[in-house]
Amino acid sequence: MNASQLVAIQVLLDNAAFAALMVATALYWLAAAFRRVPLLHELGTGASAVALLSVTGLLTARWIETDHFPVSNLYESLFFLCWCVLAVHIAAEAFARQRLVGVFTLPVALGMVAFSSLTLSPAMKAGGPLVPALKSNWLMMHVSVMILSYGALMVGSLVSIAFLIVTWKQKDPELRGSSVGTGGFQKAEYTDSESTPPAGSMLSSLGVGGSETTVTLTSATATAGTALRRSNLAETLDNLSYRLIGLGFPLITVGIIAGAVWANEAWGSYWSWDPKETWSLITWFIFAAYLHARITRGWQGRRPATLAAVGFVSVWITYLGVNFLAQGLHSYGWLSGN
């Protein structure tokens, strides 16, 4: 298979990934609006899998074409980041069995593909040989691990943002089962001072008989059921975000260390306060504070979720923002169009 055929395959898979993500995003939003139609969510999951396979095929074709791991320019790295987000999303959804995850993650993945496909110039999309500075075995160790960490941290932060939206009317929701050693995703009890007591206790206090009592009990039971569902949803989102960020943090730590070792080999210095290095350290501290607060201070709920939302912005600044706003050692091959 020659280079032109590989390029044609990449264009086809690029379009397929974009179309699949558009369909998946629409289906997940429809599934959130019409919860009684489970087929919508199943179709959305299938479309997400098609998108993941399309991106996998595109990256594989680019790897064969260029004979190196496809993270040497912005186009390749965006698709690899999209692959990471989709893979983490599908795994998290299967693990937590929570349909709401895709409502937040898939629009982000769609935005990545749309930006790389519709905004970048043909020169920035084209594959080619590595520049001398990137011809190192550290390329895959550093860059791929960093982007993997971005994917996990982004999805974890998006789940935290989902938690903030779900609980925005509750001042201080009480959660259990989200900290270390509390049982993972086991169904936890939820108490809220504003919640309606269970139907059984209301029945004993109100007695039986009388249409007014029956109507009141039915309404109160429905309210309690809605509150319980929302509580279980908040519990799952808080739990899931904690574990995803716990997965991404070691990856970004390893990626930063690998980058420092590579920098010492290439330029004789472990750390040069390059803009991307500086922001990666800021991002590391944000998520280190998140995990420290949860593990040692027992933070749960809105406070760590707010910190994770700040981390989501910091990840984007680290990955993309500094390439637009500053020049440094990490700028070549990303926005230079080489």
UniProtKB/Swiss-Prot annotation:
Keyword NAD: no
GO terms (BP aspect): cytochrome complex assembly
Principal subcellular localisation of the protein: membrane
Keyword list, A-Z: Cell inner membrane, Cell membrane, Cytochrome c-type biogenesis, Membrane, Transmembrane, Transmembrane helix
UniProt membrane topology term: Multi-pass membrane protein
One cellular component (GO) term of this entry: plasma membrane
GO terms of molecular function: heme binding
Listed transmembrane segments: 11-31, 39-59, 76-96, 100-120, 145-165, 244-264, 278-295, 305-325
Record localization: Cell inner membrane
InterPro entries associated with the record: Cyt_c_assembly, Cyt_c_biogenesis_CcsA, Cyt_c_biogenesis_CcsA/CcmC
PANTHER family named in the record: CYTOCHROME B_B6 PROTEIN-RELATED, HEME EXPORTER PROTEIN C
Record function comment: Required during biogenesis of c-type cytochromes (cytochrome c6 and cytochrome f) at the step of heme attachment.
NCBIfam families in alphabetical order: cytochr_II_ccsB
Family statement drawn from the similarity comment of this UniProt entry: Belongs to the CcmF/CycK/Ccl1/NrfE/CcsA family.
Subunit record text: May interact with ccs1.
Protein name: Cytochrome c biogenesis protein CcsA
Biological source species: Gloeobacter violaceus (strain ATCC 29082 / PCC 7421)
The gene coding this protein: ccsA
